[in-house]
Amino acid sequence: MALLCFNSFTTTPVTSSSSLFPHPTANPISRVRIGLPTNCLKGFRILTPIVQKPRKNSIFIASAAAGADSNVADGVEESESKKESDVVSVDKLPLESKLKEREERMLKMKLAKKIRLKRKRLVQKRRLRKKGNWPPSKMKKLEGV
């Protein structure tokens, strides 16, 4: 007979509940949101499972009696190792990191473009003020002079 006990501090809150993934204490899989930079999927997010690192403050207690109960405990440990091997690690998913880097690069480029255009408008205003042609409403008043 095996007894599994998890510390209450090890559970992580899940923001969106789904019937596909059970409670985090039963399954050590968390979800990561990935935004795809395609025009057809704009605004949609994809959830992918990743493995959590084992925490030091979790407690595992296994007590087995002699005889058939010891075989049951071994079966539990084997099933846990199978679950861990089925989950793909983050290192083996280069596509996600590439998409994330590309999205960050695009955001930086957009921000830099906004700054450049704003600076260009300010320089243009400064030159027009120097010549006395700014603000444009002032030019209408000076037409008759």
UniProtKB/Swiss-Prot annotation:
GO cellular component, one term: ribonucleoprotein complex
Originating gene: PSRP5
Transit peptide: 1-63
Places the protein is found: Plastid, Chloroplast
Residue ranges of the region described as Disordered: 125-145
Signal sequence bounds: none
Keyword Nucleotidyltransferase: no
Family statement drawn from the similarity comment of this UniProt entry: Belongs to the chloroplast-specific ribosomal protein cL37 family.
Protein name: Large ribosomal subunit protein cL37
Entries under InterPro entries matching the protein: Ribosomal_cL37
One biological process term in Gene Ontology: plastid translation
Subunit relationships: Part of the 50S ribosomal subunit.
Key words of the record: Chloroplast, Plastid, Ribonucleoprotein, Ribosomal protein, Transit peptide
